[in-house]
């Protein structure tokens, strides 16, 4: 009430779904998590497959989206998050974190901690990891994922405490779980790689049945096929890492082998190639170059001389964790995306921060590659007990 005049809410004109979908189709998908908070109607439209048909008709290119899965307590199912961009609002010296734009999972760090920590933690992040609502749950308590197109496949794990061969995938357009054909063999925690549009599943644990070491799934035919295992002389007691590089599948362990799909052939590898170093850190391959985090530095593999070189130009990058369980890196549309954990530097705090950075790449000569930090933000704050599971890029 002002000067005796009763105020009334602003009457927004009702826009038909077709028009709203046309508008939403022109907006970057990075803003969809925020837009889904406007109303139930917006949430339904943002998660509809019709929206992506319209984006295609409008000539919108596919976008690369980052997804993160976390386990908040022992035995609980993973929770999924996706990267979104904070919308630009009216400038304010003290942004209101209680605004309806935000939920608790949007906040990169709690307000009372922000004032007590260092400058790097005081700035509100422009990029945030937000929890995604799924229309159904995945019954598989799995640990291993990989992506093809807009689908995240969860492979290997347990259902109600029983080891299962069932496979599920998340459609990242509608955030709905679906079931794919089951594997031929139940697997606990396999290595999963994508090569030539097919999913290669490798059991890496000691004592595995080597006759069923590997099988591949073709999403086009929806069929699983058996792949002959390497000979007893080639294979070792365990496999700790799989890597797709130069259109081949490399498997590293106490012995190293490479599978050449075009020839259906296995070859033994010596340690002189030096590519086996990827077993000791998080890695990704971009434009046929392998990158990895090794002892808090980013390095890349120079295949001409079989030598690892330091990625230059990243002097301002915060110190990275070396432990594989605390850091992940992926190919993010031709750039490197790195995600890592960092303690909140407040006495008695039971929180930790999750940082993320995007790094553009520039090859300046045959033996020199430079990186440029596009952005580096705290994207989420979680309890210390929370475990980092998967960090993957999806093309939508």
Swiss-Prot record:
InterPro entries to which the protein is assigned, alphabetical: F-box-like_dom_sf, F-box/kelch-repeat_ARATH, F-box_dom, Kelch-typ_b-propeller, Kelch_1
Pfam families documented for this protein: F-box, Kelch_FKB95
Keyword entries, A-Z: Kelch repeat, Repeat
Keyword Repeat appears in the UniProt entry: yes
First and last residues of every Kelch repeat: 151-197, 198-248, 250-296
Domain F-box: 9-55
Organism superkingdom: Eukaryota
SUPFAM superfamilies recorded: F-box domain, Kelch motif
Name of this protein: Putative F-box/kelch-repeat protein At4g11770
């Amino acid at each position: 009430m002002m000067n005796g005049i009763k105020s009334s809410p602003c009457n927004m004109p009702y826009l038909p779904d077709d028009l709203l979908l046309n508008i939403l189709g022109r907006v970057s998908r990075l803003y969809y998590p925020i837009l889904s908070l406007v109303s139930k109607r917006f949430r339904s439209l943002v998660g509809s497959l019709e929206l992506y048909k319209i984006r295609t008709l409008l000539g919108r290119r596919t976008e690369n989206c980052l997804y993160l899965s976390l386990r908040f307590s022992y035995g609980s199912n993973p929770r999924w998050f996706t990267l979104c961009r904070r919308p630009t609002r009216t400038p304010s010296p003290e942004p209101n974190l209680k605004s309806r734009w935000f939920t608790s999972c949007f906040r990169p760090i709690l307000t009372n901690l922000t004032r007590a920590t260092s400058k790097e933690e005081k700035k509100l992040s422009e990029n945030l990891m937000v929890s995604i609502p799924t229309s159904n749950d995945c019954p598989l308590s799995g640990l291993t994922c990989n992506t093809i197109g807009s689908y995240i496949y969860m492979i290997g794990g347990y259902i109600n405490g029983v080891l299962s061969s069932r496979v599920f995938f998340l459609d990242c357009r509608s955030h709905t779980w679906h079931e794919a054909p089951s594997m031929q063999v139940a697997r606990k925690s396999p290595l999963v790689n994508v090569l030539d549009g097919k999913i290669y599943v490798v059991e890496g644990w000691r004592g595995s049945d080597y006759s069923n070491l590997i099988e591949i799934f073709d999403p086009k035919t929806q069929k699983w096929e058996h792949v002959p295992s390497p000979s007893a002389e080639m294979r070792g007691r365990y496999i700790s890492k799989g890597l797709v590089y130069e259109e081949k599948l490399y498997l590293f362990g106490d012995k190293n082998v490479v599978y050449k799909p075009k020839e259906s052939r296995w070859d033994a590898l010596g340690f002189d190639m030096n590519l086996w170093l990827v077993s000791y850190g998080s890695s990704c391959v971009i434009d046929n170059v392998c990158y990895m985090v090794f002892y808090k530095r980013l390095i890349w593999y120079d295949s001409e001389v079989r030598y690892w070189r330091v990625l230059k130009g990243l002097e301002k990058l915060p110190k990275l964790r070396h432990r594989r369980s605390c850091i992940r890196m992926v190919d993010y549309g031709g750039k490197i995306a790195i995600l890592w954990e960092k303690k909140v530097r407040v006495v008695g705090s039971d929180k930790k921060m999750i940082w993320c950075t995007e790094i553009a790449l520039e090859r300046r000569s045959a033996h020199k590659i430079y990186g440029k930090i596009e952005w580096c933000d705290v994207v989420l704050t979680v309890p210390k007990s929370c475990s980092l599971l998967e960090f993957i890029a999806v093309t939508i």
